Amino acid sequence: KVLSCMAANIKDVFVGTAPDASYWLLRSEDQDTEQPIEEDYWAAAIEFADSVGIDVVNTSLGYHAFDEGYPAYRYRDLDGHYSLMSHSASLAADKGIVVVCSAGKSGRGAWKKVTPPGDSENVLTIGALTKDLVNAEFSSIGDTSDGRIKPDVMAIGVNSVVSGNDGRVSKANGTSFASPTMCGIVACFWQACPWLTAKEVIKAVQQAGDRVDFPDNIYGYGVPNLWKAYQTEVEKRK
């Protein structure tokens, strides 16, 4: 379902945000457990992604609490570097990869905050919106422990159109769907502006948000207009 948000191309029914892109599917999540070693798996996946020349990564997962016996992250740990995933995501940006990740679904819970790697400065963290462009109650919020705005931008994550392995189109809720929706759009934007670095892409997406003049820790910089971002970047080149 996550992949379909980007890659689906069902004529006259459902087209994802980057249907002509090429994809690698890398699994790091152990569905039977929730242990810190899964962050190592994720870091290994990012290393592999770099080795095969991947440009943009979507990750619709994050970690806050683990199985009994393992300590959970604390708010003070959300500094963009403390967790292995956040550190690895920053290294990926240094290597030229744009990492797009889901903010998380803790908005209704006691934790509320974005989950690593979403606290990384050099990651585009995506919150979920309703069709009316209102923040979804479940969507995790910021800020980070060092005072940075999170999430970065927003995308539809309530009643998102998705397609399963059987090809049937349905609807689903979650920042896990907001993230790939935005990821595909970001990939198209970068294709149109190939002279930008990964970090410049992130900055351009933030600056294209409809709340760029008044960002907060619920909506971030808002909904980005990447056509406007494209025009801005082309104008800079003149």
Predicted regions span which residues?
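Subtilisin-like serine protease catalytic core
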Residues: 1-38, 52-55, 68, 94-96, ...
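Hydrolase catalytic cores
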Residues: 3-6, 24-30, 113, 157-223, ...
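Active-site-adjacent substrate-recognition loops and nearby beta-strands
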Residues: 39-42, 46, 66-74, 101-123, ...
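Hydrophobic, small-residue-rich alpha-helical packing segments that form membrane-like cores
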Residues: 44-50, 59, 81-82, 109-110
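Catalytic-core regions built around general acid/base machinery
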Residues: 79-96
